[in-house]
């Protein structure tokens, strides 16, 4: 494994968070994450405890478990999201990815959004929390408002998408997020990230975490093993 491949693996949220994700998918993600020392594996809550039994058995101490909260629509009551956070952490999660209440954002109820995010951050601490915007449904003003709220309440990351909407991370929407955050907190993308060219383009915008499927990660890792020069940004010390 070359150094570029190693560095890329530490930028990856390996994800199996579709409704059809199976035990075999979770096992495959655990195996791939262990082999490449991928930074995290994200699964649906019903698989969190199971995943936590796989990773130690495979000898890794550096692969985190991530779990979704209010997934995928964000419309769960805040109390429900808080309980989800507590259960995920009890089951082994070391990151939580909360879906913003999309309907409240579209309604302009930013006081609700702020309190929703704040309580999840509070419940998760010291485990870092991310907020998923589901940018497919939000306009520029809404994206900018939620980014500012995320910073205000102590979110560690802003994430573009769940992977369940018609579109995921796009250069246009990520550019808006990057412009609004200005490095105050980090950017995580997900949804439709399937090739090295896309990863490289988004990395240049400031993205430092990529939510990707097993197939997509395998494809990019294989390309980097053969052609590390195609991601020159990771070759700079």
Q: What do the PLM-derived regions correspond to, one by one?
A:
Residues 1-90, 140-145, 149-152:
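Conserved N-terminal beta1-alpha1 strand-loop-helix module at the mouth
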Residues 15, 67-72, 90-105, 152-167, ...:
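Glycine-rich phosphate-binding active-site loops on the catalytic face of alpha/beta enzymes
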Residues 25-29, 84-85, 113-120, 146, ...:
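A general structural detector for well-ordered alpha-helical segments in enzyme core domains, enriched
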Residues 30, 34-50, 54, 96-114, ...:
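Glycine-rich, proline-tolerant flexible connector loops at the mouths of alpha/beta enzymes
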Residues 30-38, 127-130, 154-159, 181-185, ...:
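Short, surface-exposed connector motifs at secondary-structure boundaries
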Residues 45, 49-71, 108-135, 144, ...:
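Alpha-helix-loop-beta-strand connector modules within alpha/beta enzyme cores
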Residues 52, 76-87, 138-149, 176-183, ...:
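Catalytic cores of alpha/beta
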Residues 99-103, 129-138:
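Conserved strand-turn element in the central/C-terminal portion of the radical SAM core barrel
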